Amino acid sequence: MNSPLIEEMSYLCTHNQIRQTMKKEIYLAGGCFWGTEHYFKQIQGVISTEVGFANGYTDNPTYQEVYTDQTGYAETVHIEYDEQVVGLEFLLNMFFKAIDPMSLNRQGHDEGTRYRTGVYYVSDDQLPIINKVFAEQQALYPQPIAVEKLPLRNFYTAEEYHQDYLDKNPDGYCHLPTALFVFARQAKDTTK
């Protein structure tokens, strides 16, 4: 017979293994990553966020290098989420509420290829959902939407001062309106 401590440890190990399998990830470029990160941090089921640079062609870029628009990178948020609480389809629909999908290389006052919008996936298993949401969004516009849909080629974490920027600097610059953060905080994936 096992002791209560061993049974509890066994339960916790099994529970943690199950929880790990429910953790999924997606990379979203929605203009300036400060606001995009803060927006997604408000959504129930988002476990963690990390800002950085995706799908460029240099190694270990700095913010100053990316800012030149000579590296091919997009400011991007790496999002880990609990699939039991929030699904990819919900997150993508929330993403489209926070961007102007018709704007090429610009969101708000921020302009340049680093501010382009994109969905960068880590598994082909994500494509059916991504394609569905893209088709629904495209149906709303007469011209093609300007949102990239590509596999993630690379991602480099941005410097520490960019991480959780709007938490550390509540009055800092953001291209997204405050009301959008309130909306995200109240939003819930009702399919879960």
Regions found by a protein language model. Give the residues of each.
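Flexible coil/turn and secondary-structure edge motifs
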Residues: 6-192
